[in-house]
Regions:
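Acidic, glycine-rich low-complexity segments
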Residues: 599
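Non-catalytic, solvent-exposed segments at the cell envelope interface
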Residues: 2-7, 14-30, 36-595, 603-607
Length: 608
């Protein structure tokens, strides 16, 4: 939710481009031509070939915008956008000619013509308006002095860019939404062209949205108006808690006018004497009294809450009781897991631990979530995590330029979407900006953008989370006249531990027999509902309908032996206000891939 390469056509280096398959539209339109006789049919066919040629050339010119990969040559990119505009304008003019407008009224297959018209219109609007706005922001930032030296980010250019990038992002998101609400094509080849275009547009929109969101929160987070102090809560998803995993240690992050500093990390053992994080009655009933593992609600278990706001409130309550925190105002919390740290090392550089092992952008997560428990004594584990966190987070904004800033911004956005990174500020104004930008993980709350929430907490004290793989499939069933949609969801958890591995692993990793015992909470979308909830495989307790801090949740415990799987299946109805596809918000795993696949072929939102 992207930047494109541009130069005069003769200077574009030969390389492979991802091109929307406009060529397939020609054959698809032949079906429509069967209903248009003689000369007019041939004319429509000829014009369709012209549309194909224009759009192929435009997409080739815009090939770099989708990956923000050519920030060193923004002038070249801008030239390509200008050339692409000529192509998309021509395609759009042809596709909205009199003959096309008549053909769009044809029975059955007229919608396919309308879809092609809509595709050309959206792409032309993007190239004419949204993309140039975005490129202007990048050009301004590229010419600015972003680094103030000594690891400090100059925040003034970011502050000045906030409004413009938000405007460009809003325009782009509106065009993508318009594209996604085009009539559902009936001809297979048109469907394929539409799907390929949707993939390209969504990729672009995701990246711009991530960048825009990060720009909105960075200045305040980095202390543009006053110094800030945050608790950096290090989670291990090998021992799952709803929001991530058991908190192994807590560091102190201070920010001041663009400079970020990492203070001492303290193990959870140093925090335990200072009590629990003030759980609500609902939280005590579900997470402590029910069991089988009774949560203590001390610092180790603060991620058991699926809402970051509750984890933050619990952290502040404990912080204020400690000798090191009682006289220091805590402005907020940052919750990070090893996947976030791994992705940061790709940007900030490798980390070498004391024994010479080099942690990179490929092996850091596996090391911190599994190998450290296999190969290192318990006494060293927290210190190794702290070293990686201190180096990776501490250098996020050092030696910054536009390319690095863009990478960090996109990373923060994508990691927040997957719950590998979350933050919360106690200042209400600051938190509203953070939450609106998508950086505060929370249970489903938007009727317009529906989500199902699935959150798991390990009930077998162990590090089995590394071996529990979760996959899901979301299939749209119907699109109602009232604006709601129905979906069928299959959510599967598999214990990938093999019996042959058990003998080589300690009880510290395996707990009781290498079982996964997953307390599973399932939330319906805001304003929607869940029905026909069933389970198969493993051993699952009957789902209890509970209330957790004002929201209905379906709760159960699933026991999964090595090699076994448990599947939850249920139907979902969204709010009538829904404008986007149903997604799944879930407890993060030890890798980037969420395991979610979506099939929306049945119908289009707001269309039959």
């Amino acid at each position: 939710m992207s930047v494109h390469r541009a130069s005069h056509a003769t200077s574009i280096p030969r390389r492979r481009h991802r091109i929307w398959p406009w060529a397939v539209l020609i054959l698809a339109l032949l079906v429509v031509l069967l209903g248009v006789s003689g000369f007019f049919g041939l004319k429509l066919y000829s014009e369709a070939k012209q549309v194909k040629a224009h759009e192929e050339q435009a997409m080739q010119l815009l090939g770099g915008v989708t990956d923000l990969g050519n920030l060193d040559n923004l002038d070249t990119v801008s030239q390509q956008i200008s050339q692409a505009k000529t192509e998309t304008s021509a395609a759009n003019e042809i596709a909205h000619g009199t003959l096309w407008n008549i053909a769009s009224k044809a029975p059955v297959y007229g919608d396919d013509i309308t879809t092609v018209q809509g595709m050309t219109s959206v792409v032309d609007s993007l190239v004419s308006d949204s993309v140039p706005q975005f490129m202007n922001v990048l050009s301004t930032l590229k010419s600015a002095q972003l680094s103030s030296g000594d690891g400090q980010l100059n925040l003034q250019p970011i502050l000045e860019a906030q409004k413009n990038i938000a405007t460009a992002n809003q325009s782009l998101q509106q065009q993508v939404q318009k594209y996604q609400q085009l009539p559902k094509a009936r001809i297979g080849m048109v469907k394929n062209a539409y799907a390929a275009g949707n993939t390209q547009l969504t990729k672009m929109a995701d990246k711009v949205n991530q960048l825009s969101g990060t720009f909105q929160i960075l200045p305040d987070f980095l202390g543009s108006d006053q110094p800030r102090t945050y608790a950096l809560m290090a989670m291990t998803t090998s021992e799952e808690r709803s929001s991530g995993g058991l908190i192994g240690s807590v560091g102190v992050v201070t920010t001041d006018n663009g400079k970020i500093s990492i203070g001492d990390f303290r193990s959870n053992g140093e925090y335990i004497p200072y009590g629990a994080g003030d759980p609500t009655e609902d939280e005590q009933r579900i997470f402590q009294q029910w069991g089988p593992l009774n949560m203590s609600f001390d610092v180790r278990d603060l991620a058991v809450y699926p809402d970051t706001s509750r984890s933050a409130e619990g952290m502040r309550a404990i912080w204020q009781r400690t000798p090191w925190g009682s006289n220091t105002q805590l402005d907020g919390v940052l919750m990070v897991d090893p996947v976030f740290l791994q992705e940061l090392t790709k940007i900030s550089g490798n980390v070498t631990i004391p024994d010479g092992t080099v942690l990179t952008g490929d092996n850091t997560a596996e090391f911190l979530l599994n190998k450290v428990y296999v190969d290192y004594p318990v006494s060293m584990q927290d210190a190794l995590f702290a070293q990686v966190a201190e180096q990776a987070v501490g250098s996020m904004f050092s030696n910054i330029d536009l390319a690095k800033l863009t990478k960090v911004a996109q990373l923060m956005g994508s990691m927040a979407e997957g719950r590998h990174f979350s933050m919360y500020a106690f200042d209400e104004t600051a938190e509203k900006t953070i939450s609106d930008a998508g950086f505060t993980a929370q249970t489903p709350s938007s009727e317009e953008h529906p989500q199902v929430g699935v959150y798991v907490t390990e009930q077998n004290p162990s590090k089995m989370g590394w071996y529990i793989h979760r996959t899901s499939k979301v299939t749209r069933s119907t699109c109602g006249n009232d604006g709601s949609q129905t979906y069928h969801v299959e959510y599967k958890m598999t214990n990938t531990l093999e019996n042959s591995q058990i003998g080589a692993l300690t009880s510290y990793i395996l707990g009781s027999g290498g079982q996964g015992v997953e307390k599973t909470l399932i939330y319906a979308p805001a304003g929607g509902s869940i029905s026909n909830l069933k389970t198969s495989g493993g051993s699952v307790t009957e789902s209890r309908q509970e209330t957790l801090n004002g929201k209905t949740v379906y709760a159960s415990n699933a026991t999964i032996a090595p090699g076994e799987s448990v599947t939850y299946s249920f139907d979902v109805t969204t709010s009538t206000k829904a404008v986007s596809d149903l997604t799944i918000d879930q407890t993060p795993m030890g890798w980037i891939d969420s395991g979610v696949t979506t099939d929306t072929a049945a119908c289009s939102i707001n269309k039959q």
